[in-house]
């Protein structure tokens, strides 16, 4: 199972930082790592056409099991021939298990050994999601990489609560493996939990590595903890994971965290950040963040980023994009979304290049300096 259908090829590590350069092979093509995965919650990366994502060299995107289960329904996606055909995307797709949405969107929830009872966030209907159901939905969706159903504890959480949660996540992971119907063409990743407790991360990693998943995710981070806590947890967690399998840090997408994660041995990242902030007119640039709605850009006829070669920056000005965002024009959101995704995918290309040339530490220093991330009260996105 560890060879198919998901295989990790190690290329080299950075002599300066230990970051890994690699390639993940899937039934729908390969992609180089470290990689950022754009999020297509409802089988679409909001406002983007698949051809545009390919043009910016996205090799894999993420879709949400919970949202697709509710709308249009996994049965409809299956009938369409699976998610790839349904959304006309022939590269790799990763689906999450639905766990995070159940724990973050639903007001009412009751966790039992069998699974989680909760209310549909759209209409209040009672729903139940279990490891078996999460596998059933993802098998129907036909993603290349599926995620095990885990419990997503809040931050901060007491040690005893977290210990029980980790034990349950391990039992659920085993049930996911048993319920997985398509191991020959869909790879199932396990999720390491344990909050900020090193002992519990060790236990979680030991349990899940013994089950021999083809890849592992580090869950329970980017949930409100300070950055130094996240970095510390990564430092003691990634070494616990097999070097010949991909490592995925869930829900992380700010430029500084992508670089910090890569330095700590992470291969895959996803986050709604670039697309979500784009809709508010916040842009990532080589000089830091730019809020295009600000009055000072009203007569600014320069591109968003003069160092960027994306479609948006080659063709449109800050003044024009500001006007579109201020008047709620959809085209404005398309332009800002395109730019932010292009920026992050390009950043990861630069990270891979820096690893190849053994200079990721230098790259981080220069980037953080330019962005102001080194300052004590550095503002994030």
Swiss-Prot record:
Similarity-based family: Belongs to the queuine tRNA-ribosyltransferase family.
EC number: 2.4.2.29
Active site (UniProt): 96 (proton acceptor), 270 (nucleophile)
GO biological process: queuosine biosynthetic process; tRNA wobble guanine modification; tRNA-guanine transglycosylation
Cofactor annotation comment: Binds 1 zinc ion per subunit.
Catalytic activity: 7-aminomethyl-7-carbaguanine + guanosine(34) in tRNA = 7-aminomethyl-7-carbaguanosine(34) in tRNA + guanine
Keyword Glycosyltransferase applies: yes
Record-given protein name: Queuine tRNA-ribosyltransferase
Protein residues bound to Zn(2+): 308, 310, 313, 339
HAMAP family: Q_tRNA_Tgt
Protein's UniProt keywords contain Zinc: yes
Biological source species: Bacillus pumilus (strain SAFR-032)
Cofactor(s) in the UniProt record: Zn(2+)
Free-text function comment from the UniProt entry: Catalyzes the base-exchange of a guanine (G) residue with the queuine precursor 7-aminomethyl-7-deazaguanine (PreQ1) at position 34 (anticodon wobble position) in tRNAs with GU(N) anticodons (tRNA-Asp, -Asn, -His and -Tyr). Catalysis occurs through a double-displacement mechanism. The nucleophile active site attacks the C1' of nucleotide 34 to detach the guanine base from the RNA, forming a covalent enzyme-RNA intermediate. The proton acceptor active site deprotonates the incoming PreQ1, allowing a nucleophilic attack on the C1' of the ribose to form the product.
Region entry RNA binding, spans: 251-257, 275-279
Subunit structure: Homodimer. Within each dimer, one monomer is responsible for RNA recognition and catalysis, while the other monomer binds to the replacement base PreQ1.
Binding site for substrate: 96-100, 150, 193, 220
One cellular component (GO) term of this entry: cytosol
One Pfam family this sequence matches: TGT
An MF annotation (GO) of this entry: metal ion binding
This protein's UniProt keywords: Glycosyltransferase, Metal-binding, Queuosine biosynthesis, Transferase, tRNA processing, Zinc
Pathway(s) it belongs to: tRNA modification; tRNA-queuosine biosynthesis
């Amino acid at each position: 199972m560890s060879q198919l259908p998901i295989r990790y090829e190690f290329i080299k590590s950075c002599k300066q930082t230990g970051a890994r350069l690699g390639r993940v092979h899937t039934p729908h093509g390969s992609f180089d790592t470290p990689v950022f995965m754009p999020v297509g919650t409802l089988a679409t990366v909001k406002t983007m056409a698949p051809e545009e994502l390919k043009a910016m060299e996205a090799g894999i995107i993420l879709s949400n099991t919970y949202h697709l289960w509710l709308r249009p329904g996994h049965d409809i996606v299956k009938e369409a021939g699976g998610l790839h055909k349904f959304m006309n995307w022939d590269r790799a797709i990763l689906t999450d298990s639905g766990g995070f949405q159940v724990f973050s969107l639903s007001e009412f929830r009751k966790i039992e050994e069998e699974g989680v009872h909760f209310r549909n966030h759209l209409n209040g209907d009672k729903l139940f999601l279990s490891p078996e159901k999460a596998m059933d939905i993802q098998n129907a969706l036909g993603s290349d990489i599926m995620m095990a159903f885990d419990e997503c504890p809040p931050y901060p959480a007491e040690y005893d609560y977290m210990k029980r949660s980790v034990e349950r996540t391990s039992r659920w992971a085993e049930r996911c493996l048993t319920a997985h119907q398509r191991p020959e063409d869909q790879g199932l990743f396990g999720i390491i939990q344990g909050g900020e407790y090193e002992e519990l991360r060790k236990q979680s990693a030991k349990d899940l590595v013994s089950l021999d998943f083809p890849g592992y995710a580090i869950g329970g981070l980017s949930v409100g903890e300070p950055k130094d806590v996240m970095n510390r947890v990564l430092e003691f967690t990634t070494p616990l994971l097999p070097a010949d399998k991909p490592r995925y840090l869930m829900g992380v997408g700010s430029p500084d965290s992508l670089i910090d994660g890569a330095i700590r041995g992470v291969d895959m990242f996803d986050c709604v950040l670039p697309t979500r902030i784009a809709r508010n007119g916040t842009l990532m640039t080589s000089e830091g963040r730019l809020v295009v709605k600000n009055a000072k850009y009203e007569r600014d006829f320069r591109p968003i980023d003069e160092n960027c070669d994306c479609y948006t920056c080659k063709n449109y000005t800050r003044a024009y994009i500001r006007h579109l965002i201020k008047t709620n024009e959809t085209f404005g959101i398309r332009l800002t979304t395109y730019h932010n995704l292009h920026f992050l995918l390009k950043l990861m290309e630069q990270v891979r290049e820096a690893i190849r040339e053994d200079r990721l530490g230098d790259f981080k220093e220069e980037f953080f300096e330019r962005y102001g991330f080194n300052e004590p009260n550095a503002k994030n996105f």
